[in-house]
Amino acid sequence: MWGGRCSPSTSSRHRASLLQLLLAALLAAGARASGEYCHGWLDAQGVWRIGFQCPERFDGGDATICCGSCALRYCCSSAEARLDQGGCDNDRQQGVGEPGRTDREGPDSSAVPIYVPFLIVGSVFVAFIILGSLVAACCCRCLRPKQDPQQSRAPGANRLMETIPMIPSASTSRGSSSRQSSTAASSSSSANSGARAPPTRSQTNCCLPEGTMNNVYVNMPTNFSVLNCQQATQIVPHQGQYLHTPYVGYAVQHDSVPMTPVPPFMDGLQPGYRPVQPPFAHTNSEQKMFPAVTV
């Protein structure tokens, strides 16, 4: 009765043995995968050989060490034949990264200097400043108001024109009123000429019309004396431009100034000198001669 049945202890033992076998297989696989990696290299013919993980498929489980030379590499189990791959210089393909080798960089790989970005940004900033300055200078030159060439060429002429008022072209109505005022002034001057003679004119106003100096005070600059009679008549305005029409006919009364006799000059600063006699003889009884005074 008991011989046909399996005890629970027997079944547990079988399960334990299966687990042990599975663990052994896993450990063997881990030991197989824990070997060294032989990096790729260039052989003597210049052909690139791809790297591999030790042990390979045809090697034994204990061949976990990369052995050989830099030009020929293989897997072995002898620690004395181990290859120092760090001293080889042909284990790097140009332009291709080698898996498992992060300690060495390719010959073509060059690090970018840290100052290059700052140099680029500074160059752009300086170029922007220069371009802005040029644009501002062009805008200021284009928008600047242009100076009148006549004003800049003849500043003295403008001052002369301000000093000497120009005679505008008179209209027909102004011409008729000026003719009436001139006739009235000439009649009044002829009426006053019988009673009193006009004062002697200087050479400067020799060409002025009759009644101009008697009725109107004209402020004439000194540089008008060099002008001839024709130019003087063109420059001096008509009397109707300075006086209103109701006051043109009135003449300015000129009073005669009596001549005062000139006393003889006497030099009293130095002693012993006689008084200076005038060049002409005086017949007036009011004049007296004073003797020289000695100090």
Curated annotation (Swiss-Prot):
Subcellular location: Endoplasmic reticulum membrane
Protein keywords: Developmental protein, Endoplasmic reticulum, Membrane, Signal, Transmembrane, Transmembrane helix
Signal peptide positions (record): 1-33
InterPro entries assigned: Shisa (IPR026910), Shisa_N (IPR053891)
GO BP term (any one): negative regulation of Wnt signaling pathway
Transmembrane annotation, as ranges: 111-131
Spans annotated as Disordered: 87-108, 168-204
Membrane topology classification: Single-pass type I membrane protein
A GO-annotated cellular component: endoplasmic reticulum membrane
Stretches assigned to the Extracellular side: 34-110
Ranges facing Cytoplasmic side: 132-295
Compositional bias (Low complexity): 169-197
Main localisation: endoplasmic reticulum
Matches recorded under Pfam families: Shisa_N (PF13908)
Domain of life: Eukaryota
Gene disruption phenotype: Mice exhibit no defects in head development. Mice are live-born. About one-third of the homozygous mutants were normal and fertile and about two-thirds were dwarf. Reduction in weight gain became apparent at the postnatal third week; about half of the dwarf mice subsequently resumed the weight increase, although they remained dwarf; the other died within a month after birth.
UniProt family annotation: Belongs to the shisa family.
Function: Plays an essential role in the maturation of presomitic mesoderm cells by individual attenuation of both FGF and WNT signaling.
This protein's name: Protein shisa-2 homolog
The encoding gene: Shisa2
